[in-house]
Amino acid sequence: VEAAYLRRLGCIACPEHGPRHMKAGISMRQLSELRRRVDRLNQQYQGKLTVLMGLESNLISLEGELDVPEAYREYFDILLMGFHLSARPTTLSECWMFQIANPWAEQRYSERYRQKATEAYLRAIEKNRFDILVHPGLHWPLEYQKIAEACQAYGVAMEISARPKHLIFNENQTRQMAETGVQFVIDSDGHKPEEIGRVQSAIDFAER
């Protein structure tokens, strides 16, 4: 937050990882305290910087389930959704699909896995309320056109990340997705203070 203020940003979103992320997931029991911390920061920086409490929820099943129950939605100013290899799936069979077979299939661009992954994303978009789809295609090959059409229909924006390894689709695919009318969000995807607000590479990509 201090880095955002020093860079004269008007607003910063601070999304934690969802609870099933095995490396960095936040417990639902921590939400009340986190909400209070964000509210205090907004008082501290009032008129200078707006701090949004967010969560990067995890896609955890082929049926499109997320690891954030709808009842907790009120805690967040902004909710993101993405797929992470470190997120714990709901069943053992999905563990095989999500964490073992699919990363291998990604390298071969298996059509079967592309279809399954796309269907899981489409179900997630249709069944859940969230604001931004983050790093689509990371670890899972996707049919981007179908994803973009669903995002446009349900009012979900797609991320263009300044973090190179999180920007999976290419310029031509981006142009095709833009034709659906879907909105894009450019962000730094910063994990360190020095990365906050560094979005020029994502802007350059979008302008091409």
Residue ranges with predicted function:
Residues 24-25, 142-151, 167-180, 193-207:
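Histidine/acidic-residue-rich catalytic or RNA/ligand-binding cores of hydrolases
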Residues 1-4, 16, 51, 79, ...:
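Divalent metal-coordination and catalytic microenvironments
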Residues 17, 182-197:
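Short acidic/histidine-rich active-site segments
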Residues 1-21, 27-30:
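Phosphate-binding active sites in nucleotide-utilizing proteins
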Residues 155-168:
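His/Asp/Glu-enriched short active-site or ligand-binding loop at hydrolase and phosphoryl-transfer sites
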Residues 22-153:
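Extended substrate/RNA-proximal surfaces in nucleic-acid metabolism proteins
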Residues 5, 72, 125-126, 178, ...:
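Non-catalytic positions within long, well-ordered alpha-helices that form the structural scaffold/packing
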